[in-house]
Amino acid sequence: MYRPVIASRKSIPPWLIILCVLGVLAALGIIIGLLVHFLAVENKIYYYQGGFKVLDIPYDRNYERETSLESNYLSKILENKMVEAFQNSNIYKQYINSQVITLVPDNNSVTAHIWLVFKDPWSNKENLRRRIESILRQMLENNPESLTTDPGSLKLTEISKVDAEKIINNRCGRRPRMSATYDRITGGSTAHKGEWPWQASLRVNGKHYCGASLIGERFLLTAAHCFQGTNNPKNLTVSFGTRVTPAYMQHSVQEIIIHEDYVKGEHHDDVAVIKLTEKVSFNNDVHRVCLPESTQIFPPGEGVVVTGWGSFSYNGKSPLLLQKASIKIIDTNTCNSEEAYGGRIVDTMLCAGYLEGSIDACQGDSGGPLVHPNSRDIWYLVGIVSWGHECGRVNKPGVYMRVTSYRNWIASKTGI
């Protein structure tokens, strides 16, 4: 019988298998290395600080006050000029941010200290610095406005990320981790990490019961009625961050300063200052909010944000994560209507929310911040959560202590 000849299979030599495996591993290593390299390069961030002089400005101490009208007006002009200069330059793709940090008045001039952030995956960093400096110098030389600037006074140096964050976090109302949007805490939504870095949790024996706002290294602002149950500093602690538990950056309380005219059980002068035993170390997630000038006006219809760990509904459950809600300031006359609060709202109070209800502060939010951003996206403390009729009721918006009415009192107790 015929049988076909079966060819014998030749086995692959072990050395060839090893060589193939090593080749594949080497190729994978190269690919991963290139990915890591390009991702690292793409995310290379450079930080700078510098300054220049604005001439022909009479000496005025108000330029030193970061919250003054004069300081914000001049800073806004200079920031707009920098944005325009960089966005119209050949490095506009590398540009991230630029801010005026401080203004220092002198005889007939003001020195603007600036802070800048760029990314550049390809250029030598010294070349990038020179290009930035050149654009700034050209901006100062070609100034068509009435503002007179001194190009020769320009200075610019690269700084580390640590130093850059320290500079920005020492200024009030800035949000390095800022979100591009803030949503519409009864009817609110969860806050992002570092989105509201001045928000604090006031605790009795470790349990959250009121909110507060960080206004200085050792001072917070809250509601006086938060201390109706206890005003012994030894029982109180303050913590920060977005989670109500576990406590983050917990601090002990040294002193509670309640407004002298506050009467327990009433709503007038519902303001208190908390002094901590030690300074708070500011970082991207924890730093102070700006206090408005006593003359600053926040008109009806202005958008504001309230934050806190208060109940989702009246006598309802409380969140573990910080909540935020966008609301609007309501005209006092409207809030004093018979349908609303029937004349109980005085000049030291303000209403905020919606007359149709649903979005509001609630139990556990008391003492917390009501804030508003100015045109430079710097946030100011407008109100302190005080009282209301339950939460989110129709014609019963939240009532807040108006911070501008207590600005001088706050300064007398804190030096801020």
Curated annotation (Swiss-Prot):
GO terms for biological process: proteolysis. Gene3D superfamilies: SEA domain, Trypsin-like serine proteases. The chain crosses the membrane at residues 16-36. Disulfide bonds join 210-226, 335-351, 362-391. Its EC number is 3.4.21.-. Residues 185-415 form the Peptidase S1 domain. Residues 37-416 are extracellular. The keyword Membrane applies. Its main location: membrane. Residues 1-15 are cytoplasmic. Pfam families: SEA, Trypsin. Keywords: Cell membrane, Disulfide bond, Glycoprotein, Hydrolase, Membrane, Protease, Serine protease, Signal-anchor, Transmembrane, Transmembrane helix. Expressed in esophagus, cervix, tongue, and testes. Residues 44-161 form the SEA domain. InterPro entries: Pept_S1A_HAT/DESC1, Peptidase_S1_PA, Peptidase_S1_PA_chymotrypsin, Peptidase_S1A, SEA_dom, SEA_dom_sf, Trypsin_dom, TRYPSIN_HIS. It is found in: Cell membrane. One of its GO terms (molecular function) is serine-type endopeptidase activity. Glycans are attached at residues 107, 235. It is a single-pass type II membrane protein. Inhibited by aprotinin, leupeptin, benzamidine, SERPINA1, SPINT1 and SPINT2. GO terms for cellular component: extracellular region; plasma membrane. PANTHER family: ACROSIN-RELATED (PTHR24252), TRANSMEMBRANE PROTEASE SERINE 11C ISOFORM X1 (PTHR24252:SF28). Belongs to the peptidase S1 family. This is Transmembrane protease serine 11B-like protein. It comes from Mus musculus. The gene is Tmprss11b.
